[in-house]
Amino acid sequence: MSQLNDISLVAQVVVFRNTKAFDQLVKKYQSPVRRFFLNLTCGDNDLSDDLAQDTFIKAYTNLASFKNLSNFSTWLYRIAYNVFYDYLRSRKETADLDTREVDTHWNTSQDDVGQQMDVYQALATLKEMERTCITLFYMEDQSIEKIADITGCPAGTVKSHLSRAKEKMAIYLKQNGYDGNN
């Protein structure tokens, strides 16, 4: 039913230029897209907000190209994925991303902040594609097939990235005091 509603909203925007319909799509997907960027940027709130805004601008301007060959969410994540990698290419920060300082401004308890910081630091040890796959699979609950569509990689490659990323994160977290029961 959700996909049908998304298609209806897309049609209203494309055919009637109904901006309120697009506002509904933004409200529905704003948090997941922002969370996706927060994980890819290892907690950089400002950058995540900027990238999310760019994603929705591109989605709006290209909405007529949505052909319903995949879910709207898959199409939107593909745009978000491209926005992020365009940003990396334009800023030539690919090498610097691994050393990015993690943003410490959180509205949660101290224990939650510490755990979130550790997760972001563990994510920072991953290659960009590994980080993308982990974020989409575990944090955005996307299937292997949808991740393959979003990234343009074969499903087997996505599985390999997930496996390597889990292994690297487990090593990092164990070295930093996590024993699997935390």
Language model regions located:
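Internal acidic/polar
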Residues: 3-7, 86, 92-124, 143
